[in-house]
A protein has these predicted regions:
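N-terminal leader/linker segments that initiate helical-solenoid repeat arrays
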Residues: 25-78
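Flexible helix-coil transition and linker loops at the boundaries of alpha-helical arrays
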Residues: 64-73, 105-116, 150-156, 190-197, ...
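Conserved small/polar residues in nucleotide/adenosyl-binding loops
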Residues: 250-255
Length: 255
């Protein structure tokens, strides 16, 4: 049954991509492209938090928007958004198919800031896949590449998320000092970009984890308490991570 379902999913992905490739031959005029890209950015902003809650619903919406879009770059941006949904539903094979299709598209295009954004999204998702299967060396390389590409792009407001992934990869490799440095850079990026404070709690409890491992409980408490101040505004999965980390922190302190 599971194998049959995987085949259906792959067939649907290739069917959708067929429409994408047909539409990729003739991009619209600049005004249309600008309007469509703004529509994508609005879609991403509105549905971003829902990916972790209703991933399949967001995926279906993204596929529908992708079919409606005329410009090929916009189509592939919608396709890239489905990558997060496959990660949430643990359909890593499907995610890898989509990543390869996006990479193939990028290789046929001229370099630009928008292409850097799209390629950064792919490398970030590749890093997440490597992290999911425990290949942290490859994950760290992908996250670093995603960060470098995003800094050449236009949507740098997502850089703190990539830096958190990079910090976590270094922590899991045992490079705690480097992990802490990436977390601190993420905080600096949040401040310099005037990003909402709701982005900061995951960085705070990431730093708390680093310091409890280093047995620096004063710094651990400081960052963990900062994270706790935003508990009411956390998403359900963020609350789970926060509370789970709370148990781990107190267990570590007891030993």
């Amino acid at each position: 049954m599971g194998e049959r379902m995987d085949k259906r999913i792959r067939f649907y992905i290739y069917w959708i991509l067929g429409f994408v490739l047909l539409g990729a031959c003739a991009p619209g005029d600049k005004e249309d492209v600008y309007t469509e890209m703004r529509a994508f950015e609005d879609f991403s902003h509105i549905n971003g938090d829902s990916v972790a809650i209703v991933p399949r619903k967001v995926r279906l919406k993204a596929f529908q928007k992708m079919e409606e879009a005329k410009d090929s770059l916009v189509k592939y941006n919608y396709l890239a958004m489905t990558l997060k949904t496959y990660l949430i539903t643990s359909q890593l094979d499907s995610a890898q198919i989509v990543i390869q299709q996006i990479h193939d598209f990028i290789e046929r295009q001229h370099s630009s800031s928008q292409m850097a954004d799209l390629e950064s999204e792919c490398f970030n998702m590749k890093g997440n896949i490597f992290a999911r299967v425990g290949n942290m060396d490859s994950a760290e390389i992908c996250f670093r590449k995603a960060y470098e590409l995003r800094m050449r792009g236009t949507r740098i407001e997502v850089v703190p998320d990539i830096l958190m992934n990079l910090a976590d990869a270094n922590n899991r490799l045992g490079k705690l000092d480097i992990g802490a440095a990436w977390y601190r850079r993420a905080l600096l990026m949040c401040d310099s970009l005037h990003i909402a404070s709701t982005k900061k709690p995951p960085i705070y409890y990431g730093l708390a984890q680093v310091y409890v491992t280093m047995r620096d409980f004063e710094q651990c408490d400081y960052y963990y308490n900062l994270a706790g101040e935003s508990y009411d505004s956390m998403l359900p999965y963020e609350k789970y991570i926060y509370l789970n980390n709370s148990c781990l922190l107190y267990t570590s302190r007891a030993h």
